Amino acid sequence: MTQEAHSTKDTESDWENTWGGKIIFSHGTSAARGTCIFIKSTVQHEVHKKIIDSDGRYVILDIEIEGIRLTLASIYAPNNDSPEFFITVRNLIESLPNDRRISGGDYNLVLDLTKDKKGGQNKTKTKSQKIICEWMNNADLIDIWRHMHPDSLTYTWSQKRPTRVFCRLDFFLISTSLVDDIVSAKIVPGFRSDHSAVILEIKLNKTIRGRGYWKLNCNHLSNLEYINTIKRTINETVQMNKESNPNLLWDTIKIAIRGESIKFGATQKKEIDKEIVRLEKEIQRLNELSTNTPLSDTDEGYLQSAKTSLCTIINQKAQGAYVRSRAENYEEGEKNKSSFFNIEKRNSTKKSVNKLRISKTEVISDQNRILDHMKTFYKTLYSQKKLENSNTFLSNLSPPKTVNEEQSIIMTKDLTIDEIAAAIKEMKSNKSPGEDGLPIEFYRIFWEDIKIYLFESYKFSLQEKSLSITQKRGVISLLPKKGDLLMLKNWRPLTLLNVDYKILAKLIATRIKKVLLYIINEDQTGFLPKRFIGQNIVSMFEIMNFCDENELAAVLISIDFEKAFDQIDWDFIWDSMNFFKFPPKIINWIKTIYKGAQSCVTNNGHMSEYFALGRGVRQGCPLSPYLFIIASEILAISLRSNELIKGILIGGKESKIKQFADDSQAISIFDKESINATFKNFEDYGKVSGSVINFDKSKLMRIGSIKDSLFAVDLDYKDVKWTNGPIEILGINFYSTFEETTKYNYEKVLEKIDKAIQTWSTQKLTLFGKISVINTVLLSKLISKLSSLPSPSTDMIKRIENKFIDFLWSSKRHAISKEMLTKNRSNFGLNFPCIATKDKSLKMAWIKRLLNSDADCVSPFLNANLKVGFDTLFRCNLKKSDLKDCSDSQLPLFWKQTLEIWCEANYRSIDQIENPNEEILWLNSNIKLDHKTIFIKEMFDNNIVRVKDLQKDDKTWLNFDSFRTKYPNVKINFLHYHRIINAIPIEYKNNRKGNDPKKTALAFSLCLKKFQKLIITTHKPIT
């Protein structure tokens, strides 16, 4: 609590940015009054009601803190006798339904004239004093500092001129029911104010927070004394343990580093704390001395010097907290730093479990019981389960691709120090370390000192097939998911692993990742380079569109595996790797880092005992996603090869499953046998892999001709739910119609943008800062939708942009036009985003994917229904209005919009054609018959593609006889041939070279012409 804060509405956001938590203000002016209550970001709380004085005199809260509800009041009383003020405050506090009350502040009066005041006039009790005393008696309130220091003569305010006066004007009144919860109450000298601070320490929540585990203070890494100490420690430890094996030596080095780091930090803290105590005592001594007699000039100088020194130390400590809170970003020009853009997430995540439901009727809050239950839960979860032998399951399958000999050789090369150094360089900073407390920053600073010992430890581990003791250990930290947080299943376990383990895991992951791109079907888009999450979403739209167009009854099956990463069986992973012919050496390396793995659970700073792991891939390990998708590819192969499952056949390719890591969707015709076979396939896979279907979250959605019906088949799996939508797939809520899906998802984006704007509107940002937030934070809510959904309506785009503009100008009059805002800064704009342009640029990226990937995987519908292949289509000179000519079937809306955008960017009018002879004849909006572009498959199949293919070497046209001689397999008549020749513009016939190609008039956020050129030049030319 602060009083006489001089806060105003203009300074509010500055204070909040610096504090990092929540502040409830009652503003005064910049020169008078103002009071507020600060709530630390880590304190779990809920404000039920707040009463705020408009004149800056009080803030009164009905608040729940750590599960305890109470009334909290910060008071700044007038400096005259104002009984009406105290009556008002009393009535407001008593109007709140709480019997626990804490009222603190500057009351501008003393309660006991004999103990709380010295000097000045000893008046009888004022009317205000009487009101306070009566209220204390009637409401069971006590002056807690006086209660704990009954005979102390300590004051919180002093006046030296014209009359020497000392008073205790600042105090806390608390309910007597809270006395047993008080840890301490003390007065500490002020150094920036004429008031001393009153500190009340109260333990509302009986939960005692543990010490947690040691983590290196990264500030030490910039301290030369610390660096020299650690270098010396490493050398001494190595000299003393020369005979130890490399693993034992490495662990010993880490233990020695930890010991010296703790010692260094403790010494620094002890020295600082000792100096603070010394200065406080000196200030207190001089203050007490001044109550009896005026200080000499020398003593007055000592007092001011002590206050200045104390202020400096406190400021240094505050600066550390300030930096840790990431508030310094506001003073660094709102740079594009992750910590700046994480304000939305900061402090919003509940990180500890204070209550837990262990049965239908019992909720526990005792930390020991909670930790015990957590340990039992995760020990059981990660214990190996008896499963069916996977050999039978795998023997019925054939891998489409396996690791070849060349890949095996590359994958199993010996590790090198340079490879380790590269991995360390790539790893992200500012991440929580594992149990040894050493972050990645430590490895970078001391790399030259430790590299040989770390390298030898890895070599020894892989040779002996066992990591060092510390490398085997992980600390499970829990993050909340959706749902009831009293249930442990609604918390996600993230394992904090030691950095030396993560480096080795990353080295292995980097090697196998390259191979996975080759052996994993493109139906799996998770974690692999050149795979895109939106690919699955677009595929779902394509399948739904195909079923609609062909009146096909089908179902979309969304399967949820319960704790999929945590339950996957290790033996099944090894068997899966053998199935794909991974070399034994790499499998043994992975087995080595899993052998003897242990974890403990941390909660509220307490840590459980370590327990052994027997299954699951740890979330937090660089290898985990790749091991998981190797195992889940077995599921996909089994579904594709299962003849009882009837998928959707599009363009010769049958779609049965789409995957993103553990997120799986199956597709089947509306047929009982096929749907039952699908679920049985998932079930059989679970029997050998450990995966368990969560039927509560698994759904069947009707699509195609039955999308609006309530049809269902009587399945063998009774728990599965039927629906017409929505089904959430990778963040997109799918309904049975495109219109409903598109509208719903963009409306949800609008809600998220609104919520984010509410958060950011409280921050004091410059215009450039707001533009950064719009382009980075707000626009990010939209990007994934624009990338994989049909374009938003014009009205929706306008609504979104209006929200951005209102945020930019704080809902006030716009100072700059939108057209000017969208220009770049070199043209005096602000780079304000144009949603329509951003949408176009994101959809253009799909053109590159179509060209650089297996087109049949990206879009089997397009691949089957376009008249020409993608390589040819994207060289055709089509107008947007002629796009319909490229396919005999109606294009799905997403692809129609994407190809229209390409046409806008790519089309060149006749006078823009640079080399007419090189122009493609077909699907060319400059070459038409009967107002339609031309495409004659027979001619195209006989390599007649460009204008030059109908010309002689001297650039004159082939006559009909010459044409038939050159292309004997083309069966067209004389009239048809000459109609084609006559359709070619005269400019082409004259081989007139036009102007240099103009750049597209579209002001795309990326240069689409360059993008087009980049795409085209990466592919072989059409001959």
Predicted regions and their residues:
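Metal-dependent phosphoesterases centered on the DNase I-like endonuclease/exonuclease/phosphatase
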Residues: 1-28, 85-176, 226-228, 232-236, ...
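Short phosphate/oxyanion-binding micro-motifs
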Residues: 1-101, 123-124, 222, 226, ...
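Short, conserved micro-motifs composed of acidic
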Residues: 15-16, 148-165, 406-410, 605, ...
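Surface polyanion/phosphate-binding segment centered on an Asp-His-Pro turn
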Residues: 62-70, 100-102, 127-129, 164-167, ...
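A conserved non-catalytic segment of reverse transcriptases
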Residues: 198-201, 214, 378, 658, ...
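Short, charged alpha-helical motifs in flexible N/C-terminal segments and linkers
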Residues: 272-379, 413-470, 476, 548-553, ...
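Conserved pre-catalytic core of RNA-dependent polymerases
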Residues: 341-344, 406-634
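Extended C-terminal regions of large enzymes
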Residues: 786, 800, 812-1023
